[in-house]
From Swiss-Prot:
Keywords: Cytoplasm, DNA damage, DNA repair, Methyltransferase, Transferase. The gene is ogt. It catalyses: a 6-O-methyl-2'-deoxyguanosine in DNA + L-cysteinyl-[protein] = S-methyl-L-cysteinyl-[protein] + a 2'-deoxyguanosine in DNA; a 4-O-methyl-thymidine in DNA + L-cysteinyl-[protein] = a thymidine in DNA + S-methyl-L-cysteinyl-[protein]. This is Methylated-DNA--protein-cysteine methyltransferase. The keyword DNA-binding does not apply. The lineage of its organism: Archaea, Thermoproteota, Thermoprotei, Sulfolobales, Sulfolobaceae. It comes from Metallosphaera sedula (strain ATCC 51363 / DSM 5348 / JCM 9185 / NBRC 15509 / TH2).
Amino acid sequence: MIRYGTYMSPFGPITLVSEDEKIVMLDFCKCAEESLVDNNSFVGLFKKLDNYFQGKRTDFDDIPIRLNTNSFRMRVYKEVRKVKWGEVVTYKDIAEAVGTSPRAVGVALSKNPILLLIPCHRVVAENGLGGYSRGVELKRKLLELEGSLIKVPSIK
């Protein structure tokens, strides 16, 4: 069964979609028709999001996700899920781990359907922030919240 939820973060609304109790989408937008929203299905995740946005170290590893994508993106997303709160890695680091180019990693991350749970905001360029599907300013705010902005090359 597909369920929709809306969480109000300090950075704007987040839409969540689950299918058979697994998250298939988490995005910074208000994309769900209000009549379809059933926030009761997301109580556990909402508590984690509350902690996250209060600046508390939060681990989303126990939240089940389902990815409908190709094997290459799956490898990239799996590697990115290893990057924990307060850490940053470069596109090059991820590329070396999965055997591809930094540009290919960037393209894969631009298609990430489950933001925060697959923390692509923690992947940065060797010379700065790099891009983010919902804008570099949001990426900056998320890294600031996690206390890791200082670790970004050329931001120090």
